[in-house]
């Protein structure tokens, strides 16, 4: 009996030490991760709208919980450039966070901020071939780089509905389409 209690005590001590180590590491890295995320978002905003001014732009609220951030993008003179949506969704294959630029009820550009899908490279290729996307490889997070610049113009709601999601990662492609539609519908005022 004493032996079992001793083993249980040692295991409890090990688990407490591990928990403290994990919590400490989280405290050290959480600020760095947040700063890197903000830097990536700013870089993406500036890639979409080259004259984007973070200080003049207005962060807005949205009732849709998939929209994690909504910004009315403005230039340094306060002129409106369009809306920037950070939209997040998840399915059985992982999470996707994209930034969607909308102006005049059309999608101007779609960029990945996070692509955690199990077939991430296929989803990335599909998005780059189906939606307006940046030719700048550095905007895309992760190891998946665009092979050729997309010349797709802005897309209306009906054009987005017509995008074929059958690819090597159909569930990821459907999730991206759903997220783009969420942003577009919010920009249209839920119409």
What role is predicted for each listed range?
Residues 2-191:
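Flexible, solvent-exposed loop/hinge segments and secondary-structure transition points
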């Amino acid at each position: 009996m004493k032996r079992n209690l001793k083993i249980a005590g040692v295991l409890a001590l090990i688990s407490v030490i591990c928990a403290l180590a994990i919590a400490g590491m989280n405290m050290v890295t959480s600020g760095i991760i947040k700063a890197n995320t903000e830097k990536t978002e700013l870089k993406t905003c500036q890639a979409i709208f080259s004259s984007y001014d973070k200080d003049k732009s207005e962060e807005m609220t949205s009732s849709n919980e998939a929209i994690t951030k909504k910004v009315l993008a403005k230039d340094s003179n306060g002129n409106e450039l369009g809306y920037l949506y950070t939209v997040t969704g998840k399915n059985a294959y992982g999470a996707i966070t994209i930034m969607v630029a909308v102006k005049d009820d059309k999608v101007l550009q779609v960029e990945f901020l996070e692509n955690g899908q199990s077939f991430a490279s296929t989803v990335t290729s599909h998005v780059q071939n189906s939606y307006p996307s940046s030719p700048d490889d550095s905007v895309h997070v992760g190891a998946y780089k665009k092979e050729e610049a997309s010349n797709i113009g802005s897309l209306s709601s009906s054009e987005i509905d017509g995008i074929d999601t059958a690819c090597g990662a159909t569930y990821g492609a459907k999730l991206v389409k759903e997220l783009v539609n969420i942003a577009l519908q919010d920009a249209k005022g839920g119409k």
